[in-house]
A protein has these predicted regions:
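Binuclear metal-ion centers of metallo-dependent hydrolases, dominated by the metallo-beta-lactamase
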Residues: 16, 90-107, 151, 176, ...
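Alpha-helix capping/helix-boundary segments
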Residues: 21, 57, 82-84, 102, ...
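Active-site metal-binding motif and surrounding structural segment of the metallo-beta-lactamase
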Residues: 38-82, 154-161
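Catalytic metal-binding/acid-base residues of hydrolase active sites
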Residues: 56, 82, 117, 143, ...
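A short acidic, amphipathic alpha-helical/loop segment
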Residues: 63-68, 89, 147-151, 174-178
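Proline-aspartate-enriched helix->loop->beta-strand connector
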Residues: 73-74, 156-157, 161, 166, ...
Length: 229
């Protein structure tokens, strides 16, 4: 499942690789994996960083992460609870803990943690800004929260991943509320195994937020998103 091509200028490529929050993002110079579970390590022959949002089974697989890290030498960036679970399997110089408002650089790519409204120990969401300034908001499996409006206004997101199912309390409606608050150029409904939920999200978006495009992803397919003009 590696992305064997480079994004166009002012763009990123991404792949959704499980029914949860598993996303692979490729910028011009870096490959970043988020919440890898239910997939084989050999699917990721290249990785510069793995980001973990929280410690639940559908987001954190310590054995898989250790296998990918050993093969690629990548850096692991994780919330405090996940970092604690990884501390004995990841070299100390390759494991970085992150909390909301912290920022870590992966080369010229910025990784910033934000709040996540989800019943885990200390969950985070991630703002990833590419070398070209393309802004991606990976919201883990967060429910909406009021601060999203200010975050969206500040960041002017190009793409936001919105949970529409599986996680507690989530639905197409809560996913749409994340999009409504953040107002991205492109909204991606994920964290579901229901195409019906994704379609419902798309209908809400078209009716209530027509200036935001909906991209319904298929598993393992490569998509490109460009910086807003």
């Amino acid at each position: 499942m590696p992305i064997d091509k480079t994004p166009e200028k002012n763009a990123i490529l991404f792949v959704w690789f499980n029914h949860y929050a598993g996303v692979l993002i490729k910028t011009p110079s870096k490959t970043i994996i988020i919440d890898p579970v239910d997939i084989r390590a050999r699917s990721f022959p290249d990785s510069d960083a793995i980001l973990i949002t929280h410690e639940h089974y559908d987001h954190l697989d310590p054995r898989l992460i250790a296998e990918i890290q050993k093969a690629t030498g990548c850096t692991i960036i994780a919330d405090p609870a996940s970092a604690q679970r990884l501390q004995h399997s990841i070299p100390p110089d390759k494991l970085q803990q992150i909390r909301p408002c912290d920022e870590i650089k992966v080369g010229e790519v910025s990784v910033k943690a934000e709040k996540c409204n989800h019943p885990a120990t200390a969950p985070v969401s991630y703002i990833i800004t590419s070398e070209d300034g393309v802004k991606v908001f990976h919201t883990a499996d967060s429910l909406p929260f009021p601060e999203l409006a200010a975050i969206g206004e500040r960041e002017k997101f190009d793409v936001v991943f919105c949970t529409v199912g599986i996680a507690p309390g989530t639905s197409p409606e809560t996913g749409f509320e994340i999009a409504r608050l953040t107002k991205p150029q492109v909204a991606v409904p994920y964290h579901t195994n229901s195409t019906e939920y994704q379609q419902k999200f798309a209908e809400l978006l078209k009716a209530e937020l027509p200036r935001t495009a909906c991209l319904i992803p298929e598993l393992h397919k490569i998509y490109q998103v460009s910086k807003r003009k």
